[in-house]
From Swiss-Prot:
Subcellular location, record wording: Cytoplasm
Binding site for Zn(2+): C325, C327, C330, H356
Protein name, UniProt field: Queuine tRNA-ribosyltransferase accessory subunit 2
Gene Ontology biological-process entries: tRNA-guanine transglycosylation
GO CC annotations, alphabetized: cytoplasm
Main location class: cytoplasm
GO molecular function list: metal ion binding; tRNA-guanosine(34) queuine transglycosylase activity
Family of this protein: Belongs to the queuine tRNA-ribosyltransferase family. QTRT2 subfamily.
């Protein structure tokens, strides 16, 4: 992995260029990773993604918690001359990272043991040792992967739990560092420690004590429990910890923070020096029937962060979900149609939502890179913060609790959600 900084400023963070493997494409940072579930971009086939979302090479974020059942098949695939993990899941031409936890779903707490990390999968809880983890990484052969770590911490975690997470991570990583040479993939060193600056420093110190070339970048874990919890983080508590950590890291290695952080939080983290994020926020919005409508192109109009597809007020609204959006959903369909698809529980509903949300979110990152290059990130941040309104916009995502009963529909589809 090669990472080169093109520009850096105190106010706008840094603009970089990342080459994950020799001969591969270069990616501009800040970079958006494409979140997957079970090896697939949620609701989308490869053809739909590449024809209606993006034709450019992407970095796919694979998670062991949703793909652990593929280990045996991947062992045979790669031993037989398979072309790699992305080809196996039907997304050739894209690079990939293997991570432990699904950022889209809440990770249960507990189940920690001295030498074992709990991995919560679709089949239940699996026990993951350092040895077993490296065997699975060798089977998957990702382009780069996350080091094994105990990230079971959040803002409410006690000091004892935080210290255990750091100590256990050091023990896991001691084995990983010793045996990483058996895997032809780049390692990301995990930085854990909750919201405790001393614990974070200890975790960073352990990583930086390793010989040169032991890892290619950093991944920050342990700030939240994934899922919607990342959309409600208190940035006044988060940002000082991130700033404390970044000051202790060398500049020539990329930094990743997985999770469904809000657009505003992402802008503030970029200003702190974080380089990579994932698209789980767009997925969480789609899952809860919300179309992203926040604006990042400055104008004089007040904007809302979301369009609630479940809202009865749009059932006769025949305007696009977002005006001036060039995605398939907004060019071909209306708000009323999306509401109809929701009411009838049609699969096309989430497909159209994720097409729009990914298109919008990827355009947002294009705007971010443009703003960083011009040293105008603070201006963009303030616009995203208020959306031309008088107060700060709430970008947190609430779980959709509306349920449509088929029995209540009768012979038509006019039943209200309950």
């Amino acid at each position: 992995m090669k990472f080169a900084i093109e520009s850096i400023s105190k106010n706008s963070g840094r603009l970089g260029q990342l080459r994950i493997k020799d001969g591969g494409p270069d990616f501009k940072t800040p970079l958006l990773l494409q979140t997957t579930k079970g090896g697939s971009i949620p609701w989308l086939s490869a053809d739909v993604f590449e024809s209606h979302v993006s034709q450019k090479p992407q970095v796919l974020q694979f998670t062991l918690s949703t793909m652990d059942h593929m280990t045996e098949a991947l062992t045979h695939w790669n031993s037989g001359g398979g072309r790699g993990l992305s080809d196996y899941v039907g997304l050739p031409g894209h690079l990939n990272i293997l991570m432990l936890r699904d950022p889209c779903e809440t990770t249960p707490s507990g189940g920690n043991d001295r030498d074992i990390l709990p991995l919560f999968t679709r089949r239940g809880k699996e026990s993951l040792s350092s040895e077993r983890y490296m065997e699975m990484v060798a089977s998957f052969k990702p382009d780069f992967y996350e080091g094994l770590c105990d990230a079971d911490t959040n803002l409410e975690s006690a000091k004892k739990r935080i210290q255990k997470s750091v100590d256990r991570t050091e023990k896991f990583m001691h084995y990983i560092y010793e045996h990483r040479g058996k895997v032809n993939s780049t390692l990301l060193a995990p930085i854990v420690g909750g919201y405790n600056t001393f614990a974070r420093t200890q975790s960073i110190k352990h990583a930086r004590e390793q010989p040169a070339g032991s890892y290619g970048g950093y991944i920050f874990e342990g700030f939240h429990t994934n899922g919607l919890s990342a959309t409600t983080l208190d940035t006044s508590k988060l940002l000082p910890i991130v700033e404390h950590c970044v000051k202790q890291l060398e500049e020539d290695k990329p930094r990743l923070m997985p999770g469904a952080y809000t657009p505003l939080t992402i802008l503030e983290l970029i200003r702190q020096g974080i380089d990579m994020f994932d698209s789980s926020y767009a997925y969480c919005a789609s899952l809860n029937f919300k179309a992203l409508t926040f604006s990042f192109v400055q104008d004089a109009v007040e904007h809302a962060p979301f369009l609630d597809i479940t809202d009865e007020a749009i059932k006769e609204d025949f305007t696009p979900p977002l005006s001036n959006c060039s995605c398939l959903t907004c060019q071909k369909h209306t708000r009323a149609y999306l509401h109809h698809l929701y009411k009838t529980n049609e699969l096309l509903g989430p497909i159209l939502l994720i097409v729009h949300n990914l298109h919008h979110y990827m355009a947002f990152f294009e705007k971010i890179r443009e703003s960083v290059a011009r040293d105008e990130l603070p201006r963009l941040t303030e616009f995203v913060r208020n959306q031309n309104g008088k107060t700060q916009v709430d970008y947190s995502i609430a779980a959709n609790t509306k349920v449509i009963s088929k029995a209540a529909m009768g012979k038509g589809f006019a039943a209200a959600a309950v």
